[in-house]
Design a protein with these regions (language model features):
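Second-shell residues forming the walls of enzyme active-site clefts
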Residues: 107, 125-128, 132, 157-172, ...
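Flexible glycine-/small-residue-enriched beta->alpha junction loops
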Residues: 190-207
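Flexible hinge/switch segments at interdomain interfaces of large molecular machines
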Residues: 239-245, 286-290, 443
Length: 443
């Protein structure tokens, strides 16, 4: 986190002095941004505001929203942002040069593999991965992916998980994102197993009802500590969706609130808690999955929310998380017909809104490409290429990992994807890994 803020704070100096190359400028444009120096971990409230949109729970189609947060103040016992020294332009150029030098030393194949965030089963071919040994070592040498995502079946107990993740990381030439879905509530891969030693927090909607930013900050901070102790460095959380449809079961209580301002405050606090603990956070599922009734795990899901509605509601929590410095955003598979005819994670228009309208310059990742909204219409190679052409940086869990890699490499060789486009995404990936201390680049 310190490195990310240092690099960002010196952008203007670097540009003015002309010390970076075009590649360096691309790097800086990719950095996640944090606008607040203090953790917003408490919230004062006004009288309840009656919302016109439905509440998030199907059994209560018309409910008033919780008190909206206004002018949050940091309590005295909340950890304050440590003072950071300013890097000189020369030091900043050194950060840039290290990343660019590392990128220059990678082969095309190595760079393409970095774009994939898969499961240990997909990587190795085993049925259920609960350990990492020679098979994992050989698989990572052949297919050096950018990240691995673990599920409850992989996590037997704390000691087993810690050993598995330590071994896995030791086999990687370029250090891996080691990720898990730990939202709380019904999506708690580690917390749902008492043997893991990870706190099983309540669903996001419970915290949204209380609208206590300090409490949510502590949830993020605790998860960062507990997951980090196991070897994880990325949490696919928080959910930044605003549930505006009471019949939405895919998101439901995974959302903090049907009030975008409350949801935004909670998302900001969760991102802050996670990332101050050096855990990469991932906002999901842009451009917002709270208005739908159908499940993209099963097939196509369509939203008819207008751009104005999205800007005034669904995008408020995403903007709050981005402003707090979230390093990654996940795109959903839903098709918003007012934005694009394509699933969101294959849509240049959706990526453009995220980059330009919301100012996000970190890693954009797809939702799982094993879900019906993708597999019913695209093969693995086609979906991966379309996502990268749209401007996405990482492909999550392609149905056929090798076919996805082959499709991307063939597209580069054919000129429908350029190596410069690949480099752009890999630079973002390396930058986040470097900034969070996952990738160590010494002089």
């Amino acid at each position: 986190m310190r490195t990310l803020k240092i690099i960002l704070s010196a952008i203007v100096i670097v540009i003015c002095l002309g010390l970076v190359t075009f590649a360096g400028i691309l790097l800086f444009s990719a950095l996640p941004r944090e606008k607040s120096d203090q953790p917003e971990t408490s919230v004062s409230t006004d009288p309840p505001v009656q919302e016109e949109t439905p509440a998030e729970t199907p059994s209560e189609p018309e409910a008033s929203a919780p008190d909206a947060p206004t002018d949050p103040e940091v309590p005295a016992d909340t950890p304050e942002e440590p003072e950071q020294s300013e890097d000189t332009a020369d030091e900043l150029a050194g950060h840039t040069a290290r990343i660019q030098n590392y990128l220059a030393g990678m082969t095309l194949d190595e760079k393409i593999w970095q774009l994939f965030f898969t499961t240990p089963e997909s990587l190795t071919g085993v049925t259920t991965a609960t350990q990492a040994g020679d098979t994992t070592k050989a698989a990572l040498a052949e297919r050096p992916v950018g990240g691995l995502c673990y599920f409850a079946a992989n996590l037997v107990d704390a000691d087993q998980t810690r050993t598995m993740l330590q071994n896995t990381q030791s086999y990687a030439k370029t250090p891996l994102f080691l990720g898990v879905d730990e939202e709380g509530g019904r999506v708690s891969r580690a917390g749902s197993n008492p043997a893991m030693g990870v706190t099983h927090f309540e669903a996001a909607a419970v915290y949204g009802e209380r609208a206590d930013m300090a409490e949510v900050y502590q949830v993020g901070s605790t998860l960062a500590q507990e997951l980090g102790a196991l070897g994880f460095n990325l949490d696919f959380a928080p959910v930044a969706d605003v549930v505006t449809n009471p019949n939405n079961t895919e998101i439901g209580d995974r959302s903090y609130s049907s009030d975008p301002q409350v949801a935004g405050a909670m998302v900001s606090a969760m991102v802050d808690g996670l990332q101050r603990g050096n855990m990469v956070s991932c906002l999901k599922h842009f451009p917002g999955h709270g208005s739908t009734e159908t499940d993209t795990h099963e097939g196509k899901s369509v939203s008819n929310r207008t751009l104005e509605e999205l800007q005034g509601c669904e995008w408020v929590p995403f903007q709050a998380g981005i402003d707090k410095g979230a390093a990654m955003v996940m795109l959903s598979h839903l098709t918003n017909e007012n934005l694009s005819d394509l699933p969101s994670d294959l849509s240049p228009e959706v990526v453009s809104h995220l980059r330009e309208d919301l100012g996000f310059q970190g890693i954009i990742i797809t939702d799982s490409h094993q879900m019906g909204a993708i597999t019913d219409y695209y093969d693995s190679g086609e979906a991966a290429v379309l996502a990268l052409q749209a401007g996405v940086d990482m492909i999550l869990m392609p149905m056929d990992l090798q076919a996805a890699f082959n499709g991307v490499k063939a597209a580069v060789e054919a000129g429908t994807l350029t190596e410069a486009r690949i480099d752009e995404s890999v630079t973002r990936i390396l930058t986040v890994k470097y900034g969070f201390g996952i990738l160590n680049l010494s002089d």
